[in-house]
Amino acid sequence: MDYLPVFLNIKQRDCLVVGGGEIAVRKIRLLLRAHARIHVVSPAISEELSNLLLQSPVITHTAESFRPDHLQDRALAIAATNDHEVNRAVSAAARKAGIPVNVVDNPDLCTFIMPSILDRSPIIVAVSSGGTSPILARLLRSRLEALIPSAYGRLAEYAARFRDKVRQRFIHQENRRFFWERMLQGPFAEMVFAGRDQAAQDYLSEALENSTDQFPTGEVYLVGAGPGDPDLLTFRAMRLMQQADVVIYDRLVSPAILDMVRQDATRIYVGKVRNQHTLPQTSINELLVKLAQEGKHVLRLKGGDPFIFGRGGEEIETLSQHHIPFQVVPGITAASGVASYAGIPLTHRDHAQSCVFVTGHLKDNTIQLDWPALARPNQTIVVYMGLLGVTELCRQLIAHGLQATTPAAIVQQGTTPNQRVLTGTLETLPDIIQQNPLKPPTLIIVGNVVKLHQKLAWFNSTSEPMGTSSGPGYP
């Protein structure tokens, strides 16, 4: 470790910034956030810095070239000029005076360096590459942004407010640690994140009253995992995935996403392959209730969005009947995510003014849909779970008025490295699929917007425009 990470209290302390340009302004704004008094030394300053001087009474400016006596009584110094000799002089003088000094973009002249900062005050996270690659440090910070929501600052304020009460309630440090670990990772934290301040305060007070390891009923997180690409997960989904005790998942959750769940969480697979459910839906509902009543934090992870053909509504109805706390986290539904990765806009001014989502499950070799409504012109049809019923689907759409030459596409495992796009028409698509076996999950898109696929496809996947021997896939 080349540097010792420390946090320096410079509130109401005098700090020197040498320089008057854009780089100096960035450092000054950072010092302002730490409530420092700032003394700027520079023969000339930028318009932006001039405006900052007018806005902030804690900034003063001396229109001179740097001299060592400018360092007198300063807590730290920052050299932010584009003149190497000036920067070297500031560094040498500060070192001689025993004052911490930072020279922007020159670690060799620094006695301290400025990290990339994630500010969730009073929580502060600093990331540093030791001056070797500031860009890499910023990239790492951006990853942390996804894992540490802004509400963590409020959570820290709550912890500070109750710290003395917790210390009085729990004599032994180990018990205090256990208490705070449960509070800061459980329902209390989620209440704070959701802005339910009174409920959070009541929950914490009740936990203190009980002062045992027995906590109230658990909670269920109904989370949409999106169409497959882990990068499409929401911040909230990622956070809840890391604090679950148990995860209940099905086939539509990709392995890459499942790998992001807390490693020591118990995993329960509930199937959801057509006609081969490992557990029927009623049993899944009952399992969620049972686990939550045991005090567990249960992650119900569903592909896509839990409220779009995901039966999420049925599950939370059962939870509500049993007074089980729950949260619902939306996910990017397959229609939106897969179409985007396939380069097929679902609406387009020249091609489609409406879009409809339907499920293509076969029942007794038929699909029960409002066919006249689906066969309207200037409309995009997105069919979930339609692979086995594609022949019936295309036949009915043609029978109810759509042209046989209407463009159609089927996308295999969209948004993942295994994505594959086949395009054709209502007339040709069943034969195309017959000749090119696909692996579920798949999504079917019907409408003139499919014509745009070849032009707009951007994701690195297999794309195969196809038709029959009599002609191209579509006009």
UniProtKB/Swiss-Prot annotation:
Protein EC: 2.1.1.107, 1.3.1.76, 4.99.1.4
PANTHER family given in the database record: SIROHEME SYNTHASE, SIROHEME SYNTHASE-RELATED
Positions annotated to bind S-adenosyl-L-methionine: P227, G303, G304, D305, I308, T333, A334, M385, G414
Domain of life from the UniProt record: Bacteria
Gene Ontology annotations of biological process type: cobalamin biosynthetic process; methylation; siroheme biosynthetic process
Sites of Phosphoserine modification: S129
Annotated spans, Uroporphyrinogen-III C-methyltransferase: 218-475
Residues binding NAD(+), per UniProt: E22, I23, P43, A44
Protein name (Swiss-Prot/TrEMBL): Siroheme synthase
Species the sequence originates in: Nitrosomonas europaea (strain ATCC 19718 / CIP 103999 / KCTC 2705 / NBRC 14298)
Entry similarity comment: In the N-terminal section; belongs to the precorrin-2 dehydrogenase / sirohydrochlorin ferrochelatase family. In the C-terminal section; belongs to the precorrin methyltransferase family.
An MF annotation (GO) of this entry: NAD binding
UniProt keyword Cytoplasm present: no
Keywords: Cobalamin biosynthesis, Lyase, Methyltransferase, Multifunctional enzyme, NAD, Oxidoreductase, Phosphoprotein, Porphyrin biosynthesis, S-adenosyl-L-methionine, Transferase
Catalyzed reactions per annotation: uroporphyrinogen III + 2 S-adenosyl-L-methionine = precorrin-2 + 2 S-adenosyl-L-homocysteine + H(+); precorrin-2 + NAD(+) = sirohydrochlorin + NADH + 2 H(+); siroheme + 2 H(+) = sirohydrochlorin + Fe(2+)
Active-site residues per Swiss-Prot or TrEMBL entry: D250, K272
Name of the gene encoding the protein in the UniProt record: cysG
Entries under NCBIfam families matching the protein: cobA_cysG_Cterm, cysG_Nterm, PRK06136.1, PRK10637.1
Annotated metabolic or biological route of this protein: Cofactor biosynthesis; adenosylcobalamin biosynthesis; precorrin-2 from uroporphyrinogen III: step 1/1; Cofactor biosynthesis; adenosylcobalamin biosynthesis; sirohydrochlorin from precorrin-2: step 1/1; Porphyrin-containing compound metabolism; siroheme biosynthesis; precorrin-2 from uroporphyrinogen III: step 1/1; Porphyrin-containing compound metabolism; siroheme biosynthesis; siroheme from sirohydrochlorin: step 1/1
UniProt cross-references to SUPFAM superfamilies, sorted A to Z: NAD(P)-binding Rossmann-fold domains, Siroheme synthase middle domains-like, Tetrapyrrole methylase
Region (Precorrin-2 dehydrogenase /sirohydrochlorin ferrochelatase): 1-204
Main function: Then it catalyzes the NAD-dependent ring dehydrogenation of precorrin-2 to yield sirohydrochlorin. Finally, it catalyzes the ferrochelation of sirohydrochlorin to yield siroheme.
Pfam families (UniProt xref): CysG_dimeriser, NAD_binding_7, Sirohm_synth_M, TP_methylase
